[in-house]
């Protein structure tokens, strides 16, 4: 498998994970952190850091919006227990 295909597959898997977490609003970040060692906020931080490595500036709120599918404060009000 060449690197381009590998990167495309990895990107698709990441987006699928993000979509899965958007659909599973019942799963709290604290539960994810306790069980898996990462949460939605970690994913948004990693997304922002990888963008920075490529010379792309993404704000923390924009990175979180990508992961949560809505502004973070809105998600917290609606779904955080």
Predicted features and spans:
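Domain-level signature for proteins that mediate thiol-based redox and metal-cofactor handling
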Residues: 1-81
């Amino acid at each position: 498998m060449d690197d381009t295909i590998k990167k495309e597959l990895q990107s698709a898997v990441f987006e699928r994970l993000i979509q899965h977490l958007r659909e599973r609003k019942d799963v709290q970040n604290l539960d994810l952190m306790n069980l898996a060692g990462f949460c939605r906020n970690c994913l948004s931080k990693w997304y922002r850091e990888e963008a920075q490595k490529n010379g792309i500036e993404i704000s923390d709120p924009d990175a979180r919006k990508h992961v949560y599918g809505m502004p973070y404060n809105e998600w917290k009000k609606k779904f955080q227990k």
